[in-house]
Amino acid sequence: MTEKNNMYKPSLHFTPSYGWMNDPNGLVYHDGIYELYYQHNPRGIDWNCMTWGHARGTDLLHWEDLGDVLEPDENGLMFSGCAIRNDRGLLGLPEDALLFFYTAAGHSSRESKGKPYTIRLAYSTDGGNTLIKKDGKLANGEVIETLAAENRDPKVFWHEESGAYILVLWIENNDFGIWRSEDLEQFTMTQRVTLESGYECPDLFRLPVISAKEGGRETGEEKWVFWTAHGYYYVGSFDGYEFHQEQERRCASQMGPDVVLPYAAQTFSGPEKVLSVSWLRTKCVGGRTTGMMSIPKEFSLIRNKDGYILRQKFPASVIEAFAQTENGILEGACYRKFRNQNPQPFVPEPEIMGMHDEDMEWEIRLLSKETCLLKLECQRDTKKLFFTRGIVTDSCDLGCELENLELIYDHGILELLGNEGTFYLAVDFPELRAEAVDRIEMSENLKEYT
């Protein structure tokens, strides 16, 4: 759990005790535990000196910060990678060992001057507490051959149908590579694929297709999704050797008032559901930490007339934690789920009238001790969403009608899911980082539901 003695830290979005953080790394589930590693600069609040930090949790909401586990060396700073459980007992290690594939960023430090980025291996035999670096089979200790000066960000998973481990990697520009291995020692490249606007931090996973008309039941259909850092996703097929894109790229996140906040999402290895965490590019408040992790999301696909659309939802354990509270407020953070019963303009109460009220379809107010910290207003005609804090108002384009929405607000961080999870928006209000919510109000045309 985040430290309580730092008033500028969120309650439920993980941040380290101190320093800069970015990409989630090595997400793996084992023995009822979620391990969360992450890019960390323990020396300051700006990007530098990349190490792997480590946190652990059991409910996808509360995390224990366990410090740094993978330090820079002569091969470079420790850039992004992944983790898997050694289920097949390979590499002379026990089945319960955790295996980590990571990027050593050559020429990123004085010690690694003149070296390229290389993909390397580490392991843990104590449940992920201690990571031990291990040379790969190539002459210089690499796991796979370097193809470009800064190729990076390996993601590894087992593909049952073809009986091999798959490694995906960003190579350069919009190019990604796919490798296969049966023993995690010898890897064979099977595809170099170009993805429109794709850049770094790849992931490749299979998702169930959910019926949009039958209460969210699975249809029995499955599709593969290739994921890249900006939240661009590409739906297609994968046979264990090659990925074939079948529809145009889409983006999983909506543009906020000034930025698409989520970046470099990664899925957990191990759990039955496909669970993803992204880095939220939040600002430093109070001089202690920069950046935080999103609340995890469970992924599936919905198929409609436009094709396959990513569906995101907050995990059941997250919702249950809020449901067990008296009023849906947990450690100063809140969760609510609304349905828009009447998409018509409403007449606001006189004391909360604002400059846009005559055009508003609905509004939500987050309060602390009778003070409105944040007001959300949806404009009827333009489908803009306005965010008001005191006399400051920002807005962003929704691009669609929101028939229903879920929100989690946590000390200045707002995550919104809409339209059964096909809409996702995250916004940072750093000036509210020290503020806890104790009550929520809404316009009459919004109805809470579970």
Segments and roles (model prediction):
Residues D239-D258, Q266-T450:
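Beta-rich accessory regions
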Residues E111, A265-Q266:
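A generic local secondary-structure boundary/capping motif
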Residues M1-P154, W158-C201, R206-V259, S278-T325, ...:
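Beta-rich carbohydrate-recognition and catalytic domains
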